Every structure is written in structure tokens, then in C-alpha cells.
Amino acid sequence: MELTILHLYPDTMSLYGEYANIAVLRRHLEAMGVTVNLVKVTSEDVPDFTNADLIYMGAGTEGTQKAVLLGLTHHVQALREALDRGCLLLFTGNAMETLGRSVTDAQGQVWGGLGLGGFRRQAGQAADVLNLLGIQ
């Protein structure tokens, strides 16, 4: 079995050393006999979700989160198409917030989200603990 993991923005969305999450995931998959192809997409690249089986994005600062959100807005249709064909998303920390309808920052400015989930997020709001977010 072969699995392609697309690591989105490891250069900017790596607040807590997200490379280690990917390394552990890869090691466990390979121990199970899975061949892992890791594709890193930096903020300088145009993301291509065509062959991705899993898309991973880690947490970033509030500023990098907004920059990434603005960049991904241009690729939301391609991201939807990847989800429609069965690609999985694993977004940690504030990266998950980008998937909702909006993110309101500490100054009250509302940023449009990618709209893949029906939730909204506000700075200072108690974090929801989710085991799984199923996006339909």
C-alpha cells in the first residue's frame, strides 16, 4: 500500500515543531508496511491536491494563520475536489480554524474561512476538544 501525505506550509505553520508529528506518523505507517510519499508544500508553492491521500497542516501564529487562510482561499475548490474523492484532512491547532466559516481575531476583525465546516471561531473562545471533525 502507498500513501501520499501532503504537508501544507511546513515553513510557516509549524509553531510547535509539526515536523515531528509528520515524522511519527510516517514511522508508524512504514512500520505497518505502508510506503509513504511525503510532499512538502511551502508558502512559496502552489498546492496540488490531485494525488494527496492525506493533507496535514499544523498550528501557526495568528498572523501566519491569516496569511495561509488568504492563500488557501484561492485553492478551496481544488481542496473540495480532493475531499470529494476521499482525501483526508488532519489540521492541528489553529489550522483547523481555517476550515470553518470564519475566524474572528482578538481585535474583532472577521476573516472568511474556507467554508468546509459549518463552525465559526473567535479568539479567546474556549477551545473545543474534538476527536474527529467530519466535513460533508
Locate the predicted segments by residue.
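Conserved anion/nucleotide-ligand pocket segment
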Residues: 136
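N-terminal beta1-alpha1 cap of cysteine-dependent amidohydrolase-like domains
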Residues: 1-84, 122
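Cysteine-nucleophile active-site neighborhood
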Residues: 62-133
